[in-house]
């Protein structure tokens, strides 16, 4: 076997070369220590250079957000499984603020507030990220809200219209149909999506905060069944998640929407619901030992919602003309809209749709209280056709509610009041809709116009909805030209209005009420009986003709 020999000169040369190329480097890393932890909150000593809202890394790759920056310690919210965080563990700075991945790859997916998929469909490929805490668009970067966003719900589109870039609050007690109203608004965007025109398409984001997992799964199933998941993203922070996730979820949905808005696209975000986000933030603040205020909420709970909802905007044409429309949901107790969180959000938003439990229990669904529901954008967010036919609808319904309450105590009513009550009852019936069945704006315009013309006055109240459905089917066949002329919400001219009434009169001749009676407008002449004839005085004028 050959003997391996290395000369001393070779060894010396190798060492000299190594030492000549070596440059000593030193890195400085701040390390903190967990001093105590409970309920998703950790107090960390050290880390003197940490920034507000900076991401911190706990053992096992678990992240936290630095919220409290005290002189000697940091109060951090743990994002994820906090059960394994223990006293004495090391915590490191990341130097990053919280951000989420964004992009079209999120359409059709269900994610958590960190942007991670939780639907079992694999990873989401995205090269872009967006910080959760970003300044909202300034006044000069916006333009007035004038483009309608159709919800497909007659009562909303006619009386409390929503525009692209608006913030419209949906408020009411639990189990009054708040989520159903917002899901209908998402479903109604399907026709716009199928056009392929980005100026018409609306991408939707549904943010579920503190709901049961089964409820979120039900919403996803409803969207899939109607083919709406292809343009929708669900951000889920169910009740089983930590308070930190519930606090962050709305900001995640808003960040994803802002990314599309600044690309010149249109976005609809549903926050379901912000009451639970406020409760989660209250829990975080109390655990961080922040001083409590009214109803034990921290002093900055108004800022929690205002900085979120101010991101909704209709951008100027110079920035692409994109929009972000927000439908925040707030849950009340015993219809009390004067509580702390409801009044806060009412003052931030551009109007509210108030759903009343009494109306819901009476079968009026959607259970919208017309009296205190309002849109501060108003007719500017309506199409010309809808604006023309719905002008008096709110007033008629408000007068009907008032007269209805009065008639409960009045023993006798005049004919005009009775007619107003009859018309009002039919209008209420006409505005009822089944869940997950939005109505195109053309059908809404036709129905509301014909109701104003008194077409439904002769129809029994119980048959109004069946009459409307069959009438619209018939009009689509016999008056298709009228529908073409008002497509997209254009105004109804005199000739088309006359054609609608004539086609409706023909249909009424064939329609049978549930009791088998006809509903034609003309009152049939009744023959006088013998007694009435006997009491009549008949004057006969005789004329004499002289020869």
From Swiss-Prot:
Reactions catalysed: ATP + H2O + 4 H(+)(in) = ADP + phosphate + 5 H(+)(out)
Residues reported in the UniProt entry to bind ATP: 172-179
Function in brief: Produces ATP from ADP in the presence of a proton gradient across the membrane. The alpha chain is a regulatory subunit.
Protein name (database record): ATP synthase subunit alpha
Keywords annotated in UniProt: ATP synthesis, ATP-binding, Cell membrane, CF(1), Hydrogen ion transport, Ion transport, Membrane, Nucleotide-binding, Translocase, Transport
NCBIfam families: atpA (TIGR00962), PRK13343.1 (NF009884)
E.C. numbers: 7.1.2.2
Membrane topology reported for the UniProt record: Peripheral membrane protein
Main location: membrane
Transmembrane segments: none
Compartments in which it is found: Cell membrane
Subunit structure: F-type ATPases have 2 components, CF(1) - the catalytic core - and CF(0) - the membrane proton channel. CF(1) has five subunits: alpha(3), beta(3), gamma(1), delta(1), epsilon(1). CF(0) has three main subunits: a(1), b(2) and c(9-12). The alpha and beta chains form an alternating ring which encloses part of the gamma chain. CF(1) is attached to CF(0) by a central stalk formed by the gamma and epsilon chains, while a peripheral stalk is formed by the delta and b chains.
Annotated site residues (Required for activity) in this chain: 373
Source organism (scientific name): Rhodococcus opacus (strain B4)
Record-stated family: Belongs to the ATPase alpha/beta chains family.
CC terms in the record's Gene Ontology section: plasma membrane; proton-transporting ATP synthase complex
GO molecular function ontology, one term from the record: proton-transporting ATP synthase activity, rotational mechanism
